[in-house]
């Protein structure tokens, strides 16, 4: 049965409205003019995917005697050599990676760069002073200086080894907590956590993995108590993004905290130096209503039509100039999307899956239009 009047050249899918209970068989046939012919998939047909071999890091053992192994984790893409083809930047997490709420040593985190052929271009070892887990390492891959080759920007520390084998800072530094025995809980607490020590922000060459520029990390940890606890569960919640804050060039924005204090710092890379653009901090007078509004994720988009990107940081939005645009006051959420959800409504809208029951919202806050304080 012919189901469309015209070729599906402008469509990406067909939705069958048949609601019967009998099984349905779908067939796709090649047709030239009025003649139908069968379609055969040859035995040596190319795969619909690339099979890229990976170089798994060696297993390890923590100071407490726990063995661990590695599995591929988050990945990003970028053209690091300017040949017009993407490379894959892959993070390896150890099997003992931890959520921030959990104590324990972790193995070291590795970041690799692979050609689509499987050739390993470089490997960065973030070292013992960068804890492994979903919230700790947000690596940004982009051509920040417009030279046609992508760079990699991420948080580092003493002992990080770049793609050329050079150690950043003090190679002997070990900021991991040995642990404190809690008599009430009858167990060792804080072991493996990193509550002090140097943190850096490093720009790496996407082509070689070489550390091109390193500076003190902003937002800085400071005293973990300033973020709401003493075990770095809140202070070590990291996010990051890439945004066209001036509408022309890409900036990298490093973020810290979302349960209590929130700090965002925007930087521009000119090929030689990482220049601080602005810092937004909820501890600054006037920004208090933006505290406690962060998500486990964020979104970037031009929501007010000024040609510059804003940052949707959970239940609040930071304007392109580093000033607070609005805060809904709805608090922490788990998943957020920014798009034109309602085609009949002008502008972009935000949908946010909240982590707490907020009940029925008043009309002024039940709006999905992100141009105003709504969700």
Locate predicted features.
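Recognizes extended acidic, P/S/T-rich segments that occur
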Residues: 1-23
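Extracellular fibronectin type III
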Residues: 31-48
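Beta-strand-rich domains and repeat architectures in extracellular enzymes and scaffolds
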Residues: 53-99
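Repeat-based blade/solenoid architectures
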Residues: 55-74, 127-138, 220-239, 283-298, ...
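Beta-propeller blade termini
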Residues: 73-80, 137-145, 149-151, 239-245, ...
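Acidic/hydrophobic-patterned starts of short beta strands in beta-sheet-rich repeat architectures
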Residues: 82-92, 146-156, 246-256, 305-313, ...
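Short, conserved, GDST-rich strand-edge loop motifs in beta-rich repeat architectures
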Residues: 90-108, 155-195, 252-254
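Beta-propeller blade signature
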Residues: 107-117, 173-176, 196-207, 264-270, ...
